[in-house]
């Protein structure tokens, strides 16, 4: 019997009423919800969004906290989306924004184009 793959949609389905520990919601990239999560770890992509991809753990769920979100805003304000385009050239399972933070318009647009799900949670990165 084939082993069932765990997808981003499965991650969202874990948040059923009464089991809503992560309080996740999909805010962009819905077409990518069938993407498989093959590595059960997270990655903080600070180095990647600054342009360093040599050791980028793209197979992991990418977790964006306060620092990463502030840097995304700086990239947006300076109209620099090259590194974001590079980020989405990798087949990332999904990105999660903590503390109800939201990605920039550029980030959301590129995620949509790459079919990369963007999830949001009100929880802090340390929760």
Could you tell me what each predicted segment is?
Residues 102-109:
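Short, glycine/polar-rich helix-capping loops at beta-to-alpha or helix-loop-helix junctions
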Residues 114-127:
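Long, charge-dense
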Residues 90, 105, 120-122:
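Internal alpha/beta core interface subdomains
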Residues 88-93, 112-116:
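Short, surface-exposed connector motifs at secondary-structure boundaries
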Residues 93-99:
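Short internal beta-strands
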Residues 65-67, 99-100, 122:
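Fold-independent oxyanion-binding glycine-rich loops
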Residues 2-88:
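Gly/Thr-rich phosphate-binding loop signature of adenosyl cofactor/nucleotide-binding cores
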